[in-house]
Amino acid sequence: MIVLSVGMPRAGSGWHYNLINDLMMASGAADARVIREKYKLQKILTEVNCNISVLSARRLGMVSIPALLGNTFVIKAHSSPTTASRFLTSLGLLRVTYIYRDPRDAMLSAYDYGQRALAKGRPNAFSHL
């Protein structure tokens, strides 16, 4: 089974992923970082938090292989549901958790994040706010 940890950007989704991953590992699930290495999924599950990015049929198909082989693990995304993710959810192969943050607070967090990046000379997508 794949547990998908989803959240809007700047909502604490990294913290949410780590919390869910640690809880799942404590209950016997595999560490997604180990799954990523073992099944050569580095191009699909990126970043420290095993972010799948787009929930396309191809990407979900690739990460389904370890799940179909009996592994349970957690991955992260910021994207909205797709036909492929809904299908895997209906089969019980994908379970979804979601973290929500008041959009006004998330906007302030994004603004602060962008300003800190500008101050360091490394502008990002939030720097223009």
Language-model features, listed with the residues they occupy:
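PAPS-dependent sulfotransferase catalytic domain
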Residues: 1-129
